Amino acid sequence: MKKIYPTGLPFLFFFVSLSMTTAQAPSITAATPSSGTVEQWGKFEVQLDVNATWVNPYDYDEIRVAGTFTGPDGAVKSVDGFFMQDYTVSNQQTGALTNVGNGRFKVRFSPDKPGTWTYVLTITNAAGTGTFAPQTFEATAVSPDDNPGFVRTDQTNYLHFDDGRQYIPVGENIAWQATNPYVDYKNWLTKLSDNNGNFFRLWQCTWGLGLEWKNGSNGYLGFRKYKQNNAFYTDWLLDFCAEKGIYIMYCLQYHGQVSTNVNPNWSDSPFNTVNGGPCANTWEFFTNATAKNHTKNRYRYVLARWGYSRNIMAWELFNEVGWTDQFEQRKNDISAWHEEMAAYLKANDPNRHLVTTSYVNEYNDPNTWNLPDIDFTQTHFYVETPFLERTLAGGVRSYLNDYGKPTINGEFGLSGSGAGLGALDPDGIHIHNSMWGSLFGGGLGTGMSWWWDNYIEPKNLYYHFAPMSAVAGVVPFHAANMAPAPASVSGVPADLLMTPTQGWGALSDTSFIINSDGSVTSAGAGLGQFLYGSEWNTQHRRPPIFYVSYPVSGQFKVRTGSDTGQSPKIVIWVDGIKVLEQNAAVNQTFTVNISAGQHVIKVDNSGTDWVTISSYTFSGLGSGVDAYVLKSENQTRMAGWVLNNSYNHQSVQSGGVPAAASGGTLQVPGMSNGAYTIKYFDCLTGAFLNSAPVEVANGALSVNLPDLLWDLAFVVEDQSVDVAEIPEPLHFEVFPSPTVPGSAVILEVDTAEKTDLQVTLLDTSGRALHSQSAGSSNGGRQQISFQLPGDLPGGLYWLKMTDGKRTSGTKSIVINR
């Protein structure tokens, strides 16, 4: 589990009240729109002058401003207004704010159709209701490149915009700021956008852009008194996201607020009776009527102020709600709370934003995932493994099968702590592999790394998003209704390594059948990380049993992880015979020889308490290439990603760049017979590389793969169907290789027309190191000299070329010192 460290923020807040000698019905004396014209799906805002009394303008039970909007087709939509204190950013370098005025009511609305809209504004308090005369504004047709509308879901595994285009989220978590929201988010999101990222996950947390917390804590003022500087930063953030084309999964509650055990903040919660709240225990947050009404008031404010925004992809009700106190005992209450709150958002959000929630994966509840108002599911995985992409893809496929809804990996990491991650994987290889594996494993978008501020930013790993986004843009995920398909790669023999993923107390699978192609039945995410002993915590014991056939004699290995309880002891049984029993410590490997033939292998712990397991390895039963394949509903389209699985952060750190995986044949059953074209894409640049014809016979695709130093993406399309044209790739050759630092290499390129060429040197992970303009080409075949920097360490590098319209695939070059 990730660790969370609170930080303070300044706070500005104003109570506003107009004293009146006698109670009279409130009135709106003026309504000033920000503009008389707004784009379809844009932000229409009107500012109100009112004559009314109130104590707390954020309490909808006390005073309410509302707008009723009638569209050009006669359809009627209603929205709440909201009270706000306005600010300006008075210092662009620090993000400091200066308040403007004393606060006022506003109404925001997003028109879903072009044409003339009529709106009526009202204000209501205990003294009555005042109505302002009807007004109008014009909604204009959209500029499609910048404004595709809101994000929607349908009966496919993917999301799309109002205008019909697919939306594939590519991004990361950026849950809170490190210093100042304006400064940090402007920096982070600019870099994300510059690399074609289009998504991040935001938390409404007390040390971030929260609205409500205990009176006197970090500038908060208690229930229904929302922190206005944070709300203003959120206003700015949504405007900035609209400018950059970035969409947010907005998490409205995090687990620590309702926990005394995991990242606990209950002691400072306004819901706690100690602080004057209605709940004596954390779990009453989900059942107490007063508590739920406070939550709904906050939701109402959120919807009123930000529900207009098309750049909110989804409301996330809770982060990892399984970490709240007594989760297993309170599952039914928590699910009922989700049902009520999801329905509340759906009923009061005129723009029908998507709704989801999240769990740490083994602590989830199918009842909640199956709720009709939960639009998509998500997984969170933190596993110390060189093959994290397998875990993410397994989780995605499991959730697609179990719940029949789109799903996304909302968080991933190599461990629950970011400490040391920069040394463990300085180039973000696990981020690259995890994003590609999770998307082509069936996710509605890429997996989302958790470590934005202490890893992606300081290591400048944003470049991993660009090629991912480029390839996602040419794959018809949504239009073809793609879904995961079985696939295997033969001809590249390797060991089979299985990585446990299930955490403490999980109901892990116990029976695993290893098939002849190296695939594993019950693979998914069902193998437990904890191997429990015979004396303590025995209620969790679920020792795994493997049914396997070795074609030749080999080995079976068990490697322990980095944590252990008291005096564990590894026991390995083969065909009912105990062949190994040894005391276990962390990071040890236990090996037994296995003869050719069919066997039943059981692993147990006869010691006192638990030990974590890092991996189980079966020699010679795997493939050196992993394939993640998606297939269209009509079985005439396919897309996928193939990975040389030796190219992972552990192997590259310990042994350098691995040898290319050669001789692989991809096999995918269940395709319609016919003539197809396979198109390959470079995963370091996103560039189209080349295409080749391929014939499907007997309902199975079989393709000889190119040599894989790292990975390739591909699309397979029916030759009889018109598909989007992809520009011809930009090809070049490079020599000499190997060479030495400081020398010049020659790039030979053939261009059909006059063009300006740019050459870039990349390191092994795709990070740009040095760029050089090659000048203007007059067309035809020519040679370009590229000067290598003199301080390069020895090793493998990549070169890429662009002509302003096209980007080439990469070519490798070896530098010796």
Regions found by a protein language model. Give the residues of each.
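Residue-level recognition of secondary-structure-to-loop junctions
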Residues: 67, 99, 107-113, 550, ...
